[in-house]
């Protein structure tokens, strides 16, 4: 072959020119791109590259590949087995270590072997030496014992003298102890040396082998990455790794099938079972369960909060939720696993199941907030809070008007009080705060709140009317609140006034006049003329002095919500009666489920004020929502904590309400299943104040019967909004506004959806119209009335109709269109209708009393002489509640 250039040679071998020039340079030849290359130079370069790549040296790496093919029978879905070919490929790479490394490892192994032999030899020598020393010690001990025995025998035969220690025996004993201590020290030191040598040898071997192991691991990973390998992980592939394993599997399957085909109960089968039981491996003792089922019932201390679900209660008692559900079914209550239970119900269930109950208080933050108050302030006298109670139209508000020199009763709708009015009056002898409560039966909760917040109750009884139902209820509220009661016998200016009758009737309910030796003061008054009003005020102040009413004046205020409403321009407004402390503008108030900072304060006359002391009623603005009447209002220090407490109360109120609703839903469901479908009258109710809203809801709830139920789907305080109208339209409800009106947007929705809208200002009218609507929803009642009676005198046969009864109408009137009954001996034997009614061969629509007629009964021919034909009508009767 002729010489060639470097550039052509690079193109032939498939390398770049620069790389080829670099390899020539490494081989000791300097070449450029245009230089020629001879055959000798090519061979020289080839020899260098072979040497560089190790072609001439002994190979240091060897790879072995193995491939095995086997057949495995696998059961198919059709019940037949099919053969599956399984191919297993294995690849293993061996790497030869360097000679220097092998020599070093061999040297280390030789050293370790020599060291181990030396240690073994030393150990054998030490053991031999120890055995010799032990033998010498034992011989010395035996010799000493023999000498001691001989001496003791000699002493027995000689007279008793004082013993003297043998010097030789003592010396032998000391020498034995010294040898023993020396042996123990030598043995301990030898063990320490052996442990140190073994640790050093292990460390050296680890240093040598760590590099080798790392290199082998790297080479193995490279081989797996670059080589053709197959990892078998499936159960089938592992089972088919060897053909002999597959054959064993087939033989085992045939043996199992053969055993399965044996007759049951035979001797072979029994022997096989016994052999199987003998050969069956038992689990090791360490795998046995450490838990044993309790032999007796376990009683736990169950901590229950204000509300808890059934699943949470089961977790606390370490039982299944089904046990609690069964227990509550036994107690007469149906629950689900996620139903919320109140604290009392959960306590009963836990105690029934034999556990101890610990009731926990979750409102710790609320307790801390309410406890953080000024308690070190002195008490001062305060004005009495007087509640005026009595029956409707007995003159409560008129009497208060005369005291206040104002006309409030004229402004009330219908002349009756429908709100709690709070007023304070300055008299010559001091200040008095009056609460005017409604007297109508619907306002029971209002009167109860008035009695709770009061110091003295004035019971107004009309002298011409006497004791009435709400009078008795007021007496009960006063007694329940343990409040002193003063009776004001009103309307004494009327000619038919009879105060003695009032005293007599009140005595039947435990109210005895002081004139009759009782404890109650009776004052005769007239709201028109003012008779006895001064004596009444003096009696109130006298009673307050006896009670010694005192309160904190300069501390943080606390009171009770008398009334609340949602004002369109001002937002939530609450009337609060301050009971202690001084309420100031800017205070943070926690009021039931609501909280807020007081933005403005007004008295009962609408005048702006900045603070209010004890026994002063005041209107406040700035709460987050409308509080419920009767809630306690408390001034707190931190608005953030007040918000947390209010949110906590709202969540708890929601949980308790949900628990009650679920319980009532289940009860209603079972009642409906028993009694059938119940008609519902849906109502969306809005009122001007919270107290009126509660009174209306209670009155409407009392109207519900077994057949018609009043369902108040939404209630609230404030004007009727578009949301209320939309809800009423969606639920087919009546929209009711009590002393409130609908805004413009709500009126558009009401007109477009044709919602039934009702406005009321007097509670009587509202209740009467709802009762009338419920009456219209009652299922009609039908009654059968007998309108005529005819007696059969003779029977004729007609080829077209059949039997024709010749009758005489003895009572009422017989109509052809009315249904009839055929009576024989006053027993109904047929009920149907007339087919023919004739008089003198002419069809007649009706035949009256005392006339004869021919009657053909449809589908009935067994009419006999003496039978009676009774004609009746079904009449619908209107029902009332």
Curated annotation (Swiss-Prot):
- According to the record, the residues making up region (Disordered) are 142-170, 192-288
Which parts of the sequence belong to the tr-type G domain? 381-550
Q: Does the entry annotate any disulfide bonds, and if so which pairs?
A: none
Residues covered by region (G5): 526-528
Subcellular location as annotated: Cytoplasm
Family matches, as CDD domains: IF2_eIF5B, IF2_mtIF2_II, mtIF2_IVc
Residue span of region G1:
390-397
Cite the InterPro entries for this sequence: DNA-bd_dom_put_sf, EF-G-like_DII, EFTu-like_2, IF2_assoc_dom_bac, IF2_II, IF2_N, P-loop_NTPase, Small_GTP-bd
* Bias kind Low complexity: ranges: 198-207
Which ranges are annotated Basic residues under compositional bias?
252-265
Q: According to the UniProt entry, which residue ranges have a biased composition of type Basic and acidic residues?
A: 142-166, 209-231
Query: Which keywords fit this entry according to its UniProt record?
Result: Cytoplasm, GTP-binding, Initiation factor, Nucleotide-binding, Protein biosynthesis
Any single Gene Ontology cellular-component annotation:
cytosol
| Gene3D superfamilies referenced in this protein's UniProt entry, alphabetically | P-loop containing nucleotide triphosphate hydrolases, Putative DNA-binding domain, N-terminal subdomain of bacterial translation initiation factor IF2, Translation factors, Translation initiation factor IF- 2, domain 3
- One function term, GO molecular function aspect: translation initiation factor activity
| HAMAP family in the record | IF_2_B
Read off the NCBIfam families from this record: IF-2, small_GTP
Stated role: One of the essential components for the initiation of protein synthesis. Protects formylmethionyl-tRNA from spontaneous hydrolysis and promotes its binding to the 30S ribosomal subunits. Also involved in the hydrolysis of GTP during the formation of the 70S ribosomal complex.
Please give the name of this protein: Translation initiation factor IF-2
């Amino acid at each position: 072959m002729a010489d060639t250039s470097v550039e052509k040679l690079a193109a032939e071998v498939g390398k770049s020119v620069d790389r080829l020039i670099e390899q020539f340079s490494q081989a000791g030849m300097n070449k450029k791109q245009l230089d020629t290359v001879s055959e000798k130079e090519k061979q020289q370069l080839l020899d260098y590259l072979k040497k560089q790549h190790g072609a001439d040296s002994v190979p240091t790496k060897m790879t072995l590949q193995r491939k095995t093919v086997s057949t495995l029978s696998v059961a198919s879905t059709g019940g037949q087995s099919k053969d599956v070919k399984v191919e297993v490929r294995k690849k293993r790479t061996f790497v030869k270590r360097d000679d220097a490394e092998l020599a070093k490892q061999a040297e280390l192994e030789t050293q370790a072997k020599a060291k181990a032999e030396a240690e073994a030899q030393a150990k054998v020598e030490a053991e031999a030496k120890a055995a010799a020393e032990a033998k010498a010690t034992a011989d010395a001990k035996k010799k000493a014992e023999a000498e001691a025995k001989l001496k003791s025998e000699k002493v027995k035969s000689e007279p008793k003298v004082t013993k003297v220690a043998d010097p030789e025996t003592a010396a032998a004993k000391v020498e034995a102890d010294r040898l023993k201590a020396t042996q123990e020290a030598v043995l301990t030191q030898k063990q320490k040396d052996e442990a140190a040598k073994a640790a050093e040898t292990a460390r050296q071997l680890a240093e040598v082998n760590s590099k080798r192991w790392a290199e082998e691991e790297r080479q193995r990973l490279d081989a797996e990455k670059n080589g053709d390998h197959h990892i078998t992980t499936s159960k089938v592939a592992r089972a088919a790794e060897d053909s002999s394993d597959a054959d064993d599997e087939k033989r085992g399957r045939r043996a199992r099938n053969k055993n399965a085909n044996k007759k049951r109960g035979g001797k072979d089968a029994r022997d096989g079972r016994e052999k199987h039981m003998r050969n069956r491996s038992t689990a090791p003792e360490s795998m046995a369960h450490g838990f044993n089922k309790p032999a007796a019932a376990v009683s736990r201390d169950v901590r229950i909060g204000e509300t808890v679900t059934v699943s949470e209660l089961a977790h606390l008692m370490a039982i299944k939720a089904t046990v609690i559900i069964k227990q509550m079914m036994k107690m007469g209550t149906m629950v689900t696993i996620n139903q919320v239970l109140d604290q009392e119900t959960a306590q009963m269930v836990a105690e029934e199941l034999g556990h101890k109950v610990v009731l926990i208080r979750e409102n710790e933050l609320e307790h801390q907030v309410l406890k953080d108050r000024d308690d070190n302030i002195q008490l001062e006298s305060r004005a009495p809070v007087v509640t005026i109670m009595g029956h409707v139209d007995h003159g409560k508000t008129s009497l208060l008007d005369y005291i206040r020199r104002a006309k409030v009763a004229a402004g009330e709708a219908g002349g009756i009080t429908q709100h709690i009015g709070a007023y304070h009056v300055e008299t010559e002898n001091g200040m008095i705060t009056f609460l005017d409560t409604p007297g109508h039966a619907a306002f029971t909760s209002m009167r109860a709140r008035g009695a709770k917040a009061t110091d003295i109750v004035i019971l107004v009884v009309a002298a011409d009317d006497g004791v009435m139902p709400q009078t008795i209820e007021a007496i009960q509220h006063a007694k329940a609140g343990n409040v002193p009661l003063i009776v004001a016998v009103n309307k004494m200016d009327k000619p038919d006034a009879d105060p003695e009758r009032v005293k007599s009737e009140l005595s039947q309910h435990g109210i005895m006049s002081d004139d009759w030796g009782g404890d109650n003061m009776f004052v005769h008054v007239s709201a028109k003329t003012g008779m006895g009003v001064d004596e009444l005020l003096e009696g109130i102040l006298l009673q307050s002095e006896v009670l010694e009413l005192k309160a904190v004046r300069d501390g943080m205020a606390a009171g009770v919500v008398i009334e609340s409403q949602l004002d369109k321009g001002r937002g939530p407004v609450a009337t609060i009666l301050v009971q202690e402390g001084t309420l100031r503008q800017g205070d943070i108030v926690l009021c039931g489920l609501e909280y807020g900072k007081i933005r403005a304060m007004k008295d009962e006359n609408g005048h702006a004020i900045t603070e209010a002391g004890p026994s002063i009623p005041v209107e406040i603005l700035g709460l987050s929502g409308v509080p419920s009447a009767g809630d306690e209002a408390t001034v707190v220090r931190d608005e953030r904590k007040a918000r947390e407490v209010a949110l906590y109360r709202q969540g708890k109120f929601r949980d308790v309400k949900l628990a009650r609703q679920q319980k009532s839903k289940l009860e209603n469901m079972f009642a409906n299943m028993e009694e059938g479908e119940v008609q519902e009258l849906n109502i969306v109710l809005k009122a001007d104040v919270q107290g009126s809203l509660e009174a209306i809801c209670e009155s409407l709830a009392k109207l519900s019967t077994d057949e018609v139920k009043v369902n108040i789907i939404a209630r609230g305080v404030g004007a009727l909004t578009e949301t209320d109208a939309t809800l009423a339209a969606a639920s087919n409800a009546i929209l009711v506004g009590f002393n409130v009106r609908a805004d413009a947007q709500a009126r558009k929705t009401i007109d477009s959806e044709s919602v039934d809208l009702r406005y009321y200002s007097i509670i009587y009218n509202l209740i009467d119209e709802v009762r009338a609507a419920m009456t219209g929803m009652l299922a009609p009642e039908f009654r059968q009335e007998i309108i005529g009676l005819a007696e059969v005198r003779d029977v004729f046969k007609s080829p077209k109709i059949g039997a024709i009864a010749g009758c005489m109408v003895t009572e009422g009137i017989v109509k052809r269109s009315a249904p009839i009954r055929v009576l024989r001996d006053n027993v109904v034997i047929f009920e149907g209708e007339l087919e023919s009614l004739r008089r003198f061969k002419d069809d007649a629509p009706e035949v009256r009393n005392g006339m004869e007629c021919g009657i053909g009964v449809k589908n009935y021919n067994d009419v006999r002489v003496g039978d009676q034909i009774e004609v009746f009508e079904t009449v619908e009767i209107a029902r009332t509640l």
